[in-house]
């Protein structure tokens, strides 16, 4: 996501070479990546892509990480066949590109995904996580869908409008101290407003010395100084989901 006028700097990060363990499926009008644990479960997590699309190996790695901890995961194509953003794209066209990929207009796709999880996977407990553009989607969904029992929003842009703070279920917000897209003043305002308006559990956490995309776009093997922060953020995600959808 971006502070509206310029693309998210996710392309600064590393593209993980990763084969993925799940499979691609067609669910009504959308495609999705689905990963299932070896043992049966009634718990699932929806994984929402960044602007680089549902097929990005980094996002599928995160989905499979959750699957390794016992969750069915699904990463739908929320762009519904439209091209994801490419680092080579002309940045001046980003605002126009984003108009047909609005993070707050995903209800049709989410309804299809929820139906699939409940009817085809027999899921009873559902959470959602999202990165960048997907972080905005996650925040939006946690305001609209009570069946989503927990959310983790990673570095999603913050919009200061009054209907953004009445969370329906517990939500963890993770940000990076050195994120040039999301000023820390906005993060502080989000936390202040949530303290006033939210009636459910939430946490806003800022990781020092980290940049936008660090949890899913940095390869800890070649960024050893960042490894403790990457691992801590992923651990926080798992703990949050375990606490609220188990």
Swiss-Prot record:
E.C. numbers: 3.1.-.-
Source species, domain of life: Eukaryota
Subcellular location: Cytoplasm, Cytosol
Record-annotated active site: 132, 179, 212
Protein task: Cysteine hydrolase.
Chief localization: cytoplasm
GO CC annotations, alphabetized: cytosol
Protein name in the entry: Carboxymethylenebutenolidase homolog
Family per record: Belongs to the dienelactone hydrolase family.
Coiled-coil boundaries: none
Broad EC category: hydrolase
Alphabetically ordered keywords of this record: Cytoplasm, Hydrolase
GO molecular function, one term: hydrolase activity
């Amino acid at each position: 996501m971006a502070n509206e006028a310029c693309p998210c700097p996710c392309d600064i990060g590393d593209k993980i070479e990763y084969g993925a363990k799940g499979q691609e499926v067609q669910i009504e009008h959308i495609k999705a990546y689905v990963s299932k644990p070896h043992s049966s479960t009634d718990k699932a997590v929806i994984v929402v892509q960044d602007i680089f699309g549902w097929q990005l190996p980094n996002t599928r790695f995160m989905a499979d990480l959750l699957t390794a901890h016992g969750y069915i995961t699904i990463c739908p194509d929320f762009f519904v066949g439209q091209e994801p953003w490419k680092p080579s794209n002309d940045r001046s066209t980003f605002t126009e590109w984003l108009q047909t990929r609005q993070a707050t207009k995903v209800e049709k796709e989410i309804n299809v995904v929820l139906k699939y999880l409940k009817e085809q996977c027999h899921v009873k407990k559902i959470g959602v996580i999202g990165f960048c553009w997907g972080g905005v989607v996650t925040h939006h969904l946690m305001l609209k869908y009570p069946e989503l029992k927990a959310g983790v929003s990673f570095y999603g842009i913050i919009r200061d409008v009054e209907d953004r703070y009445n969370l329906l279920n517990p939500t963890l917000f993770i940000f990076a101290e050195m994120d040039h897209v999301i000023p820390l003043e906005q993060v502080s305002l989000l936390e202040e407003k949530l303290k006033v308006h939210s009636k459910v559990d939430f946490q806003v956490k800022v990781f020092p010395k980290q940049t936008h995309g660090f949890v899913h776009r940095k390869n800890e093997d070649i960024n050893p100084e960042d490894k403790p922060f990457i691992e801590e953020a992923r651990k926080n995600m798992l703990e949050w989901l375990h606490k609220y959808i188990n």
